[in-house]
Design a protein with these regions (language model features):
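N-terminal leader/targeting helix
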Residues: 54-72
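Cysteine-centered iron-sulfur cluster-binding motifs in ferredoxin-type domains/subunits
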Residues: 25-42, 68-88
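Non-ligating segments of multi-cofactor redox enzymes
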Residues: 1-28, 34-38, 46-55, 62, ...
Length: 179
């Protein structure tokens, strides 16, 4: 990934971010790195650093952030929010910026529609995998005393997907979402 060049500043960024999420406080970040050091996405993608996103957002470099594609690396696991001593909530800043990106017509990565399809079918991003013992005996969820997976109320869940606008945002066909 290319280095982000900070050429233009959006001085209204903090108010835009706070309009979307009151929990996001990039202006309070003092770059202690607790968020980045605990971030699973930062461990996988060295260019992803929640503290740097906080600083760039606070400085008003919104165009560079949303055009870089880096925001989509966030797993929204909330580890950064939990670890932050200032309660700046990097995850809320990142989600606010991705919302701004989508509102400006910037599409999420191509894998997102497939993830949404899996979520609408399975209730989770990943499909269940088989588990095997050392002896290669395959175990079911029942064998492991795990609760049943799936969507408890499919009608309500699909309605929630419509309410949040995922069908339109990700340009999914209605028939794909209703499977």
């Amino acid at each position: 990934m290319d280095t982000i060049e900070y050429s233009t500043r959006d001085t209204e960024i903090i108010s835009k971010i706070k309009t979307i999420s009151e929990e996001a406080k990039p202006e309070d970040c003092y770059t202690c790195l607790k968020c980045t050091n605990g971030c699973p996405a930062a461990k996988l993608f060295e260019e992803f650093a929640p503290h740097k996103i906080q600083v760039a957002a606070h400085m008003g470099f919104i165009d560079e952030l949303i055009n870089s594609g880096i925001l989509w690396y966030c797993f929204t696991c909330y580890t950064c929010q939990t670890r932050c001593p200032q309660k700046t909530s990097p995850v809320q800043t990142i989600m606010s910026l991705t919302n701004i990106a989508v509102s400006r017509g910037i599409s999420p990565p191509k894998i997102y529609p497939e993830m949404i399809k899996t979520i609408s079918e399975e209730g989770a991003i990943l499909k269940p995998r088989e588990v095997s013992t050392i002896d290669f005996d395959f175990l079911s969820r029942d064998d492991l005393d795990l609760p049943e997976r799936g969507i408890k109320n499919p009608t309500q869940f699909k309605e929630a997907l419509k309410v949040v606008g995922l069908n339109e945002i990700l340009a999914l066909k209605e028939s794909e979402v209703q499977k």
